[in-house]
A protein has these predicted regions:
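Conserved MFS/SLC helix-loop-helix module at the cytosolic interface between two early adjacent transmembrane helices
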Residues: 63-99
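Structural signature of the two symmetry-related core transmembrane helices
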Residues: 79-93, 291-307
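Cytoplasmic helix-loop-helix junction between adjacent transmembrane helices
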Residues: 107-145
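Helix-breaking motifs and short loop linkers at transmembrane-helix boundaries and internal kinks
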Residues: 44, 76, 97-103, 131, ...
Length: 419
């Protein structure tokens, strides 16, 4: 990690704006998981069909993520972010108008298209502005918005229980449309003289999708990161997709309370974990370039017994302890993924690389979420999938230790490896 360069003037403003964007991004995608009972009462569907609503979103979202990352590498990151936010917010509002299962399924797929562009572009924009020992913390702050959005997703079940499921989609869709207008005024890419990406652009480097994919998969480090991030999706998406239902049935909670317990405790703890992990990695990186890798591995090692506690204890207070510990430590993986990519990838392909990782994670996560619904229809406990998620985290922690800093097969100087 090089000495801290002077940050561009808007560096922390950008983090604040993207914090709100990340909050809306995840709130709009997860509210549907907390209103299962109300939604099924209004639009008849099987458990597998309910699971398919999340799976369809993930398949489209993941499938388009590499292309979405390429757009952020090739064009203005800020414009990609603004367009993505406006379109997915409009689709969130349109979801409230759905009357049939088929219409609901279509809106979820369209949301996958529009939301795919946000996270790769947002995290790459943070990396553009924060090039020294503030990167992990800045990334953690932006992903903190994601955690808050996931936690607020529990409001979907609460609103649906007290009025109608469509009201939540109408409200949050309109909020997102208004905020997109705010970003149009305030969000900007960094000045061209700041950041290695601008330097590479001035040197005439051209980002092409085919060349980017070839460069990524010629790297042993990236292949390891690709497999690691995908396998980690088993645990992450199982908790997001089925924890509210598991708590509702296992502990006999009403829908609204189950949704809040499943989202608030995990995501508030994750918010703290993002900051703790970011600060820890930033400080450690001053003496060890693999700090972001080690911090992530340690976090996964703690998250495994935490999720096992949730799915085995008969006591709700102990389950909440497990959810808090899981949320706190699994967050290390999220806040350090972009810094890890900055250690191992050609700087021109950072957003594309993150998009490719999202593809595999969403394919795995979507299959796992759908499997949860299919297993419920077959009267098999969802807790079995939580156990499989814990096993996947053990594998991920081991794989991380084989990733080493350095960009293979590129002529970019060593000083440019920090994006």
């Amino acid at each position: 990690m090089p000495d801290n360069p002077k940050l561009p003037a808007r560096a922390w403003l950008i983090v604040g704006l993207l914090w709100v964007g990340g909050c809306l991004n995840y709130l709009d995608r997860v509210i549907i998981t907390t209103m299962r009972t109300s939604l099924q009462a209004s639009i008849p569907m099987t458990e597998a069909q309910f699971g398919l609503l999340t799976t369809a979103f993930l398949l489209v979202y993941g499938g388009l993520s590499p292309f979405a990352g390429y757009l952020a590498d090739r064009f203005s990151r800020s414009r990609v972010i603004i367009t993505s936010l406006f379109v997915w917010s409009l689709i969130t509002w349109l979801t409230a108008q759905a009357k049939t299962y088929e219409q609901m399924l279509v809106t979820r797929m369209l949301m996958g298209v529009s939301e795919a562009c946000f996270i790769p572009a947002a995290l790459a924009l943070v990396a553009d502005y924060h090039r020294g020992a503030t990167r992990s913390l800045a990334t953690g702050f932006v992903l903190g918005g994601v955690m808050i959005g996931s936690a607020l997703g529990g409001l979907g079940g609460w609103i649906a229980e007290r009025s109608h499921w469509s009201h939540a989609f109408s409200l949050f869709g309109l909020i997102g449309i208004v905020f997109a207008c705010v970003l149009l005024v305030l969000l900007r890419d960094p000045p061209r003289e700041n950041g290695d990406r601008a330097t590479l652009a001035q040197a005439g480097s051209t980002v092409r999708l085919g060349e980017a994919i070839k460069s990524l998969f010629s790297s042993r480090n990236f292949i390891l990161a690709f497999i690691y991030w995908g396998v980690l999706g088993i645990a992450a998406w199982m908790v997001i997709g089925w924890m509210p239902t598991y708590l509702q049935e296992h502990f006999h909670l009403p829908q609204g309370r189950a949704g809040l317990v499943a989202t608030v405790y995990v995501n508030v703890a994750s918010l703290i974990g993002l900051l703790v992990g970011g600060l820890w990695a930033d400080r450690w990186s001053r003496t060890n370039p693999r700090a972001c890798i080690y911090v992530t591995a340690i976090g996964l090692g703690i998250a495994v017994p935490a999720i096992l506690l949730v799915c085995t204890t008969p006591l709700l207070p102990l389950a909440i302890v497990g959810l808090v510990l899981y949320g706190l430590t699994i967050a290390f993986a999220s806040t350090e993924m972009m810094p890890i990519l900055c250690l191992i990838l050609d700087p021109r392909y950072i957003a594309t690389g993150f998009g490719v990782l999202n593809l595999f994670a969403c394919l795995v996560g979507g299959a796992t979420t759908f499997a949860g619904g299919a297993l419920r229809d077959a009267h098999i406990e969802v807790s079995r999938l939580f156990q499989a998620g814990a096993a996947s985290m053990v594998v991920c922690a081991v794989m991380l230790l084989f990733i080493k800093p350095g960009v293979a097969g590129t002529s970019i100087p060593t000083g440019k490896l920090d994006c």
